[in-house]
């Protein structure tokens, strides 16, 4: 017997009638007549009263289904297949946990005596990749600590990985302070196509939050280095991340306009909300409601949309849920998530072969599964959300303090409406 899917969301605003379904990630505009007909049939729990042609269209986008649980089981099956797929190898490599910055909010803590990656560890990484002979692609993210402190290690290890002949892509998360012309020019040969650099605001705000270990400012030099990247690494996209909390969110537009006025084609800028994983009662982290107020204000007052208001629909979980996704420390120690880097209790093994903590490994692969969570299974966004960040889900399971639901969860109608407005603007602009 067919029924109205629980993964539908139907609403009207400003004389427009809209229907969203997360099983198919479809979003359609309805006539007022069809909207009223569907609403009446839903109230009677009888979809057979819907016109045959319309009912067939609704079947195609899964708004009418026989069994929602079966549809969710298919999605879960696909996720499990991906978790244990061996066609891609994703490595986050930390050549050092040391850093030249002394940022007070850094989740990694202070690694003043962090060892440097040795030739032995480098060779073990290459042998590890060779053992994964079924992998068709190799994706590397250079992380730390500050990866630019060990740029020579990045070069030697990259050249060895490229020599393996596997399809290769790389990115880097860096504070950007140690770039120079030589390093910028080298990015192309190192296949580093994406670099993320953090600025926490304009000069005054940034230098109060992101300073060198000795307390010296960093803003001006980072800006000059971003210009160097735009000039000498034109094939590399530079994304400026602005960490936001209650103390600096109201000044985001200042740094946004500053960067935009540099007119650098390969450079983009986006806000990112700082999460607090500590037990601090005086946290400056913005709660989900304030985050949405911020996003809403940017869109309604300034026409800015930094994140899509529409779910991607690719249903790809974070790489830590995949057996072939791992984080490598400078000693060859293995983690599943880069939030755990430097935490001895989160090391699950070694690049040299042995698994030392199966509990950590299995926890990340299978723990806090949203498909086992009654609240998630009833949630309209489960098919496109897949439970959100696995790290946050595990934290929630252990201490109940971290909210893992996406901002869209409590604001579905607004998000869909904003997406509709943007789509209409694009259509109108094309027709001009």
Where are the regions a protein language model picked out?
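C-terminal accessory region of radical SAM enzymes
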Residues: 285-313, 339-386
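N-terminal [4Fe-4S]-dependent radical SAM core
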Residues: 4-29, 52-92
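Short Fe-S-cluster ligation motifs
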Residues: 127-145, 402-432
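Local cysteine-cluster metal-coordination motifs and their immediate loop/turn environment
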Residues: 98-108, 374-391
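Conserved alpha-helical substructure of the radical SAM core
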Residues: 73-185, 190-193
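Non-cysteine beta-strand/loop elements that form the S-adenosyl-L-methionine
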Residues: 184, 190-203, 267-274
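Short glycine-enriched, charge-decorated loop/helix-capping segments at active-site entrances
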Residues: 110-113, 208-216, 395-396
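Radical SAM enzyme [4Fe-4S]-AdoMet core and its adjacent flexible, acidic
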Residues: 204, 208-323, 329-331, 343-344
């Amino acid at each position: 017997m067919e029924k109205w899917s629980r993964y539908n969301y139907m609403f009207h605003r400003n004389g427009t009638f809209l229907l969203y379904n997360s099983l198919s990630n479809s979003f359609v505009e309805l006539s007022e007549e069809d909207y009223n007909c569907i609403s009446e049939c839903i109230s009677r729990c009888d979809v057979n009263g819907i016109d045959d042609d319309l009912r067939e269209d609704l079947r195609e986008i899964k708004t009418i289904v026989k069994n929602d649980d079966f549809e969710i089981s298919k999605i879960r099956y696909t996720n499990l297949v991906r978790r244990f797929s061996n066609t891609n190898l994703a490595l986050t490599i930390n050549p050092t946990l040391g850093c030249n910055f002394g940022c007070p909010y850094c989740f990694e803590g202070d690694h003043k005596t962090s060892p440097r990656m040795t030739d032995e560890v480098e060779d073990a990484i290459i042998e590890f990749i060779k053992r994964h002979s079924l992998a068709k692609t190799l994706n590397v993210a250079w992380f730390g600590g500050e990866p630019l402190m060990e740029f020579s290690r990045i070069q030697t290890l990259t050249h060895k990985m490229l020599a393996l002949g596997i399809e290769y892509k790389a990115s880097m998360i860096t504070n950007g302070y140690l770039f120079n012309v030589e390093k910028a020019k080298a990015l192309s040969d190192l296949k580093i196509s994406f670099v993320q650099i953090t600025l926490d605001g304009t000069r005054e705000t940034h230098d109060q939050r992101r300073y060198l270990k000795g307390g010296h400012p960093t803003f001006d030099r980072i800006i000059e280095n971003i210009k160097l990247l735009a000039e000498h690494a034109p094939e590399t996209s530079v994304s400026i991340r602005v960490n936001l909390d209650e103390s600096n969110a109201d000044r985001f537009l200042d740094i946004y306009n500053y960067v935009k006025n540099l007119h650098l084609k390969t450079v983009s800028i986006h806000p990112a909300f700082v999460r607090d994983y500590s037990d601090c009662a005086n946290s400056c982290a913005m709660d989900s409601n304030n985050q949405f107020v911020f996003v809403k204000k940017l869109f309604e007052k300034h026409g800015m949309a930094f994140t899509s208001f529409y779910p991607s629909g690719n249903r790809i979980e974070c790489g830590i849920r995949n057996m072939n996704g791992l984080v490598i420390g400078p000693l060859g120690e293995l983690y599943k998530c880069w939030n755990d880097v430097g935490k001895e209790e989160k090391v699950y093994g070694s690049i040299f072969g042995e698994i030392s903590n199966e509990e950590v490994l299995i926890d990340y692969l299978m723990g806090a599964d949203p498909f086992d969570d009654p609240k998630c299974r009833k949630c309209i966004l489960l098919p496109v959300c897949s439970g959100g960040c696995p790290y946050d889900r595990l934290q929630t399971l252990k201490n109940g303090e971290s909210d893992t639901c996406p901002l869209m969860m409590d604001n579905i109608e607004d998000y869909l409406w904003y997406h509709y407005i943007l789509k209409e603007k694009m259509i109108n602009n094309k027709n001009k």
